Amino acid sequence: MFYFRLPFYLYCLFVFAALLMVSCAGLSTRPEPQPFPSPPPEPQLQIQPEVTADARIFPDFVALIAQPGDTFSSLASKYLNDPSLDWFIAEFNEITFLSPGQELIIPLQIEEKGGLSLKGYQTIPVISYHKFSKDKSDALTVKESAFEEQMRFLKENGYRVITMDQFFDFLDFKRPLPKKSVVITIDDDWFSTYEIAFPVLKKYGYPATLFVYTDLIIPGGKTLSWDLLAEMSKKNMDIQCHTKSHRNLTKRNSQESFREYFEALKKEVAESAEIIRRQLNKDVKYLAYPYGDANHLVVSLLKKVGYRGAFTVERGSNPFFIDPYRINRSMIFGTFNLKDFENSLVTFSDKELR
């Protein structure tokens, strides 16, 4: 009888194929797994605005219609708890005047810290004057008519004159400022500040800072008295320090030892501040360097004494990252025309921060 025998390896292959077919057949009969049921959708939280007679108050903003008697200041006081933020409402809505019936949006948070934006950053010009005259001008003397024209230019072109404290709060990230902010300063104790500049500043409602050096404060003549300084101090003129004698703080006299020089510096910045405090009953926090000069020793002494900041006469505007003890100031000379004045008012920079 004839027998056909498969090689052993073919026999194994045949058995493996048969087992695989049986296994696949068994898998095909299993039920497909069912997907897990999706969780039910969460209900959407509907935030209902608070509705008043003239406004809808949302978490991040207020939508309202201006009513008779409303002003930017009154709305800022009501919704932002600060009437000095009137400019913010005006700038956000891109309007200058407010009339009954106007629709307004008031954001309840101000995001642009330090004046930073996608396009660049805000800069604050600090302008400086020395003397004033009714009928003549020179490098350090501005004619009354020119000063009036410059202050009117600020008003008509949307600039906001801010106080020194507001400026430093901006540098410290404590508050925003209007886009076209400017600080006005005057150096020295000349009577023309009271006679000419002070009435013009009052006319436009502008604050200013007057830096005085105390050795020059003498009753009568061409300089200011403490009585006149006290009068101005009560009406938006912030009296601050220009040292005691107006000496250059960076230069040691040839006959001074270093100890004598250091003691003289302390008198210049500390004793003068104490005199102003005693005479006017006010805080002295800012100093203008005589001739605009400073060094590390002087700056360290100012910090130790308690000054918040100090000013040079370097031309240029000031971003939030400026050294607060080397603030730029642009001198306004008596030879300037209105275009020169305008060029000193740089309020924005599109330079890339690195």
Residue ranges and their predicted role:
Residues 73-74, 133-139, 192-194, 335-339:
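Short, solvent-exposed loop/turn elements at domain surfaces
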Residues 122-134, 170-173, 177-182, 190-297, ...:
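Metal-dependent polysaccharide deacetylase catalytic core of the NodB/CE4 family, i.e.
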Residues 145-175, 277, 299, 303-338, ...:
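C-terminal domain-boundary segment and adjacent tail
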